[in-house]
Swiss-Prot record:
It comes from Dechloromonas aromatica (strain RCB). It catalyses: Endonucleolytic cleavage at a junction such as a reciprocal single-stranded crossover between two homologous DNA duplexes (Holliday junction). One of its GO terms (biological process) is DNA recombination. GO terms for molecular function: crossover junction DNA endonuclease activity; DNA binding; magnesium ion binding. Mg(2+) 2 binds at residue 72. The lineage of its organism: Bacteria, Pseudomonadati, Pseudomonadota, Betaproteobacteria, Rhodocyclales. Its EC number is 3.1.21.10. It comes from the Bacteria. Disulfide bonds: none annotated. This is Crossover junction endodeoxyribonuclease RuvC. It holds the Pfam family RuvC. Coiled coil: none annotated. Keywords: Cytoplasm, DNA damage, DNA recombination, DNA repair, DNA-binding, Endonuclease, Hydrolase, Magnesium, Metal-binding, Nuclease. Binds 2 Mg(2+) ion per subunit.
Length: 179
């Protein structure tokens, strides 16, 4: 990887499971590097779980050496307690990224889905299918890893969705990526 090659770490934060995905942008081509999940033990205290997420993301950064990061923004849940817990997990992720001196971009789930699938109301399986297609993967990553990869893809295309992909040379018809 040269210093000019964007290597983007996408993060889908969660207290139980945080997805990560690393891609590179070679000219106009997206290249898959790695993806996976960082899991915390729900039997541990909240501070221990936050520590696990911070350490896990720090390890991903050390292993894959990204030079940019994209994180999914928190949505307001019906349950305020769930929203607060998700916000704390997101804070751990952003702290690890900033601690590694990475620039951090933030995208809502709607922006990410719009960028990858073409509409903001896409189901998780649609996001997974488009991630597989855009990155030419042999199989579908887990939902959390796919969401993280989708966030990285949205960032790679400037968060501009399928319009940016068409400009990058992808063929789009009726809001869908084709052959």
């Amino acid at each position: 990887m040269s210093i000019t090659t964007p290597r983007i770490l996408g993060i889908d934060p969660g207290l139980r499971v945080t997805g990560f995905g690393v891609i590179e942008l070679h000219g106009k081509q997206l290249v898959y590097v790695a993806s996976g999940c960082i899991k915390s033990n729900d039997k541990e205290s909240l501070p221990e779980r936050i520590k696990t997420l911070f350490a896990g993301i720090s390890e991903v950064i050390a292993t894959y050496q990204p030079n940019q990061a994209a994180v999914e923004k928190v949505f307001v849940n019906v349950n305020p307690q769930s929203t607060l817990l998700l916000g704390q997990a997101r804070g751990a992720a952003i702290s690890a990224l900033v601690h590694a001196d990475l620039p951090v971009a933030e995208y809502t789930a709607l922006q990410t889905k719009q960028a990858v699938v073409g509409h903001g109301k896409a189901a998780k399986d649609q996001v997974q299918a488009m991630v597989v297609r855009l990155l030419n993967l042999p199989g579908a990553p887990t939902a959390d890893a796919a969401d993280a990869l989708a966030c990285a893809i949205a960032h790679a295309h400037g968060g501009q969705g399928l319009g940016a992909m068409a400009t990058a040379g992808y063929r789009i018809r009726g809001g869908r990526l084709i052959g």
